[in-house]
């Protein structure tokens, strides 16, 4: 299973997350950089299986990126093993793993 990590020490805002996501998954410039486009890509366009891990996510970042986190949690359920989504807090300890 491929693993793709998003380091929130380097991602300060939502537009930066979308740019990083598009780069890591080699999406073309037509990627909409919004929740609907992200859902479409995650559930239909990226190679599965894949593990996506958010690292260095503090409480403030969890609030800022809450909708994106929820999207990945829902996609993890929908894809039934095709996607594993994890969050590691700033301490390095796993904060979330359901897969």
Where would I find each of the regions flagged by the language model?
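Positively charged, polar, low-complexity stretches
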Residues: 1-99
């Amino acid at each position: 299973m491929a693993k793709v990590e998003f380091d929130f020490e380097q991602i300060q805002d939502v537009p930066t997350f979308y740019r990083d996501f598009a780069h890591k998954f080699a999406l073309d410039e037509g990627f909409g950089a919004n929740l609907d486009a992200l859902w479409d890509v995650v559930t239909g366009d990226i190679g599965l299986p894949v593990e996506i891990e958010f690292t260095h996510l503090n409480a403030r970042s969890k609030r800022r990126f809450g909708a994106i986190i929820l999207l990945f949690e829902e996609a993890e359920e929908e894809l039934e093993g095709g996607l594993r989504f994890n969050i590691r807090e700033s301490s390095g300890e796993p904060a979330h793993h359901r897969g």
